[in-house]
Regions:
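Cationic, amphipathic, low-complexity segments that mediate targeting or membrane/lipid association
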Residues: 7-8, 14-20
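C-terminal helix-cap and adjacent tail motif
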Residues: 43-51, 56-59, 131, 191-217
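A glycine-rich helix N-cap at a beta->alpha junction
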Residues: 108-114, 183-204
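Small-aliphatic-rich amphipathic alpha-helix that forms the alpha element of a beta-alpha
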Residues: 72-73, 118, 136-180
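Short, Lys/Arg-enriched N-terminal segments with co-localized hydrophobic residues
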Residues: 19-38
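Glycine/small-residue-rich phosphate/adenosyl-binding loop
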Residues: 64, 77-148
Length: 217
């Protein structure tokens, strides 16, 4: 705090007001991002969209991807096992190959042009399992997929905060992706997430009413 900014010979009330203004200014400075101020959480989750057209004018950086995955790591997981894994393709040649050979379903190859691609996996037989390999309950490896979903939600919300957009794709050729990126057999390939700067503004889809999904007892 820069107390030197406080003018001398002011009343106590005026001095307190100046200190408050300095504190608020420092706080606002601390929450600035490259795109402006941080969004409030409710605004953040409502602004997130699945984007199917990306601008070729903006390249996603390695540093931005690191921020996304760091946010993903803050998600809770079964006994803190953190079994999610991320394989990011930034190279234009590699991303074109991945899109053409592994994302040709539902025109995902076209929808993700000019976007970085993140393959998301989880190490199976850990989350939801005891050390001897016995499942803790009937869900089994569903817990690994569940935990990865929690991580990926953090990732796409962080992308929104940074002014980036995403598209989660489940239609992909997992075998070809595994071979192309040398993903171990001990990991289950779940989704591919496109990350980039939106070149469209999708409307917000209608959501279910609370009474359709929520019950109190």
């Amino acid at each position: 705090m820069n107390y030197a900014k406080i003018q001398p010979k002011h009343t106590l009330k005026e001095s307190i007001r100046q200190i408050f203004q300095i504190c608020v200014g420092n706080l606002l400075d601390s929450v600035k991002t490259e795109g402006g101020f941080l969004m409030e959480f409710q605004t953040l989750i409502e602004n997130r969209r699945s984007v199917r057209k990306y601008s070729f004018h903006t390249n996603v950086t390695k540093e931005q991807i690191q921020q996304l995955v760091q946010a993903a790591l803050e998600a809770p997981s079964w006994k803190n096992t953190e079994t999610g894994r991320y394989y990011c393709v930034l190279s234009e040649d590699m991303s074109q190959k991945l899109r053409k050979e592994c994302l040709c379903y539902a025109n995902n190859d076209i929808k993700t042009e000019h976007a970085a691609l993140i393959v998301t996996t989880f190490v199976h037989n850990r989350a939801g399992f005891q050390t001897d390999g016995t499942p803790d309950n009937e869900i089994g490896n569903g817990w690994g997929c569940y935990d990865l979903g929690l991580q990926n939600e953090n990732l796409i919300l962080k992308a929104t905060e940074l002014g980036l957009s995403t598209l989660i794709m489940g239609l992909r050729d997992g075998d070809k992706i595994r071979e192309m990126l040398s993903i171990p057999e001990s990991e289950t390939i779940v989704s591919v997430i496109a990350v980039g700067k939106a070149d469209e503004e999708p409307s917000r889809p209608r959501r279910r009413e609370l009474e359709d999904v929520l019950k109190f007892f």
